[in-house]
């Protein structure tokens, strides 16, 4: 699924643009890195996003940047809430809130409330780290740790026409909320 094909000229999309057949990404955290920074690669092995986890803050803050260093989204874990919640912001606007279900035996469940209206649902296996994100029952993305033998690596397959940066931000939120 994630074969390295550097120098392949067929698909010259910019990071975050949607492809006709969907997009695939690899999130691979660096073990023992200060602040848990890591890169997100596309299916050709090219680095397309940088995830900067801010260390030593009172609340968890994660920034997803493009390769030019431009901030695309900021993720912030909200403290003192009845259930775990992370906000996804673009600029100064909150675009989504990821909330973990209070009780979900044997499965992780999340609701992603979109400020533009509507919501996404994410459900997956606690043990296998396999998740599916849906909108009204229609798959938006599949997230899998099983695709890789390397610890702390996720594969993300995003359906066509979706906001790749938002889906990747939701993936990072799910990872933080399940730790």
Task: Give the ranges of each region predicted by the language model.
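Intrinsically disordered, low-complexity proline/glycine-rich segments
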Residues: 1-179
